[in-house]
Amino acid sequence: HTKPASIAQHANTSKSVWRYLLAWQITLLLGLNSFLNYIIITWLPSILTETGHSATQAGAYHGAFQIATALPGLILIPLLAKLKDQSALSFILAMLSALSALGLLYMPSFAFVWTLMLGFCSGACFILGLSFISLRTDDSQQAASLSGMSQSVGYLLAAIGPMLAGALHTTTGSWSAPLWLCAIAGVLCALCGLGSGKNTTLAKSANELL
C-alpha cells in the first residue's frame, strides 16, 4: 500500500512549481515585499524632504530604515521554530507595512516611527518568504525550483517598483500615488501571506493547481 502512495507523491513533486497556487503565494509574498521595499529604499529621502523634514533628518531616517530591516533576523528565526502556522504573523506584518506607507503620507510628523516599522516589517516578510521556500516544499529539487521562481519574479518586481513610483511622482507632482501603491502592495502581500503561511506543502496542496 505504500508504493502507490510514494508514486503519487513523486508525481506531485515532479509537477512544475509554476502550476501551484501555493508557489505563487510564496513568490508574490516575496515579490510584492521587494516591490514595496525598493520603492522606499530609493525614494524615502525625497518623500521625507517633501513632507517637511530636513535633508539631515531624511538621511538619518533612511539609515534607520535599512538598520530596521536587519532586526527581524534576531527575533523571527527563533520564533519560526515554535510556530507551525505562520499565516497570522505574515498577514499582520505585511498589513503593518501598508499602514506605515499611509502613515508617511497622512501623519508625516511620526515619520521616524513609520520608517522603523516599514523597515522591520519588510525585513520580517523577506525572512518569512525565504523560510517558506524550504518549509512548503517536499524535496531539495522542488525547493530549488521554487527559489528560482520566487527570485526571478521578485527581482522583476523590485526593478519595476522604483521606476513606477518615480513615474507616478513625475506625473502627479506628489508622493500620494506612490505611497498608495506601496500600501496596495502591502495589502496584497498580506493576502499572499495568509496562504503561504499555512502549515502545508506543495504536494499536499496539489488540488490547488493553476
Give the location of each predicted region.
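Helix-to-loop junctions at the C-terminal end of transmembrane segments
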Residues: 72-85
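C-terminal transmembrane helical hairpin of 12-TM major facilitator-type secondary transporters
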Residues: 84-132
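Helix-to-coil boundary motifs at intracellular loop junctions of multi-pass secondary transporters
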Residues: 47-52, 82-83, 132-140, 171
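Multi-pass alpha-helical transporter architecture, strongest
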Residues: 174, 180-210
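Juxtamembrane intracellular "pre-TM" segments in multi-pass secondary transporters
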Residues: 2-26, 210
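A late C-terminal transmembrane helix in Major Facilitator Superfamily
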Residues: 137-175, 182
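Hydrophobic positions within alpha-helical transmembrane segments
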Residues: 61-65, 115, 146-150, 178-181
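Extracytoplasmic gate region of multi-pass secondary transporters
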Residues: 19-73
